[in-house]
Amino acid sequence: MNKIIVGLSGGVDSSTAAAILHHQGYQVEGLTLWLMKGKGQCCSEGMVDAAYICEQLDIPHHIVDTRNLFQANIVDYLVTGYSAGITPLPCSQCNKTVKFGPMLAYGREKLGIDKIATGHYARLDYDSKSDRYLLKRAIDRNKDQSYFLYDLTQYLLAGSVFPLGEMVKSETRRIAAEYGLKTADKPESQDLCLVESSGSMRAFLDKYITPHQGEIVDREGRVLGRHDGVHHYTIGQRKGLGVSAPHPLYVIDLDPAMNKVIVGDRDSATKMESTVKLVNWVSIAPPSTSIRAEVQVRYRSLPVAANIIPLGVNEEKPQDGFRVKLIFEEAVFGITPGQAAVWYEGDILLGGGIIENEK
């Protein structure tokens, strides 16, 4: 009988993934990561629900303490980024360093199981010609989470299974109800797992970064208003600026050194090109010449056609890894340092990386 570990968060998606594999005849074992050092939605109600699901399915349940790993790779990563005036993307970082890697290692080293499954909406194929696993968008484009998986290596993809990739969300809930899962009607979480259910990202960051009031200025340096902490803002933001103007204003830059938020019109918040670092080539080997693909610069943004020019590794900054230049075919709004740029050919995710702060 094939053995597999299912990462259980306590939500309907991971619960249904476990139930599907269990009913397909897999020998399933549930695994829940203990992420937060304090109270949080992901490690209270979620852990209890995950344990209940394992009891319902009559499968073992393992809890792995990854609190220190989560603190170092996610919390500290966020705080460092926001302090520097960028907007980090914790989910892709978490998937690689806290979830998939540690789960696969635990399964192989402790349980003798070399496959893991999650409730992510994504698909995997194997291309024998290139000897590579191809990461693809889910059938349910509205729920597709491949964007957050761009940083997974071939090693991690080879050990991963996504049972929900061919399903739409309504089908997931229907199957959960058919199996009588407790989580069938559980609402989806609307926040990052590290944001306490009664709080917000702003409140979370304020625990680690002391807010300092400063000036909101235009590109010419004219003072238009006051802000309550640079780390509360992100590129492209319009709401919550508290600045009166004859036309809409957007955040176009952040200067934490001078404690200033710079605003401008919408055109000032658009770009025709960007540089991306720490690139992970997923479904293809690193190209030696430019390629054309559809690039997504935020999770919910529409893909834009672009030429992707390989820059290789900067010998002066090897820590930035493989870099590329993106030349867009049309202006793109709100390109934000710290977020991921991910490129696709059709449904196939070719690669992705972190948008550089090009100051």
Curated annotation (Swiss-Prot):
Disulfide bonds: 94-193
The EC number(s) this enzyme carries: 2.8.1.13
Protein name per UniProt: tRNA-specific 2-thiouridylase MnmA
Primary subcellular site in the record, as a coarse category: cytoplasm
Gene3D superfamilies referenced in this protein's UniProt entry, alphabetically: Adenine nucleotide alpha hydrolases-like domains (2.30.30.280), HUPs (3.40.50.620), Translation factors (2.40.30.10)
Site entry (Interaction with tRNA), positions: 120, 339
Gene behind this protein: mnmA
Role noted for this protein: Catalyzes the 2-thiolation of uridine at the wobble position (U34) of tRNA, leading to the formation of s(2)U34.
Family according to the record: Belongs to the MnmA/TRMU family.
Subcellular location(s) of the protein: Cytoplasm
GO CC term, one of those recorded: cytoplasm
Residues of the active site: 94, 193
GO biological process: one example: tRNA wobble position uridine thiolation
